[in-house]
């Protein structure tokens, strides 16, 4: 990825018109799951979503579909959004040999702003957890990016 952190990537998506910020109040369930499933159906060019007003949480934000379209994937690589898919894959392969990279330690990392300490921590009180699909056995904190292809295509 061409960015040092999620914040700078989200800013790049916003600058390219690929981040839809939603400030209306939503419920973690079912609204966030419905939004996640809807973005998958939009098709080519679906934006990333940012929710910052989640019922029951004072300072929680959720972002999803950050690399759920080829435009967003291109932006994540620091390429123009209209970069052809083959060129994106070629660029990804070219960069592969540079990984893994050594972690960079910082005196005051940005994630420290959102740290909770203690012995009695309940994630349901802190995070707007939601199930993505009916029948999910539990709640997911993240979901990986998977670029795949049908072997018969």
Stretches found by the model and what they are:
Residues 1-152:
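Extended, highly charged
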């Amino acid at each position: 990825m061409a960015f040092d952190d999620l914040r700078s990537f989200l800013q790049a998506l916003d600058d390219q018109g690929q981040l839809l910020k939603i400030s209306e109040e939503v419920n973690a369930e079912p609204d966030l799951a419905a939004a996640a499933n809807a973005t998958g159906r939009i098709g080519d060019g679906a934006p990333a979503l940012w929710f910052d007003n989640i019922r029951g949480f004072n300072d929680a934000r959720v972002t999803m579909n950050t690399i759920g379209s080829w435009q967003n994937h291109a932006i994540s690589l620091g390429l123009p959004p209209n970069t052809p898919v083959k060129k994106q894959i070629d660029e990804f392969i070219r960069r592969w040999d540079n990984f893994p990279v050594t972690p960079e330690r910082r005196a005051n990392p940005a994630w420290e702003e959102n740290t909770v300490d203690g012995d009695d921590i309940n994630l349901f009180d802190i995070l707007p957890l939601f199930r993505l699909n009916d029948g999910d056995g539990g709640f997911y904190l993240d979901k990986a990016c998977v670029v795949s292809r049908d072997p018969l295509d």
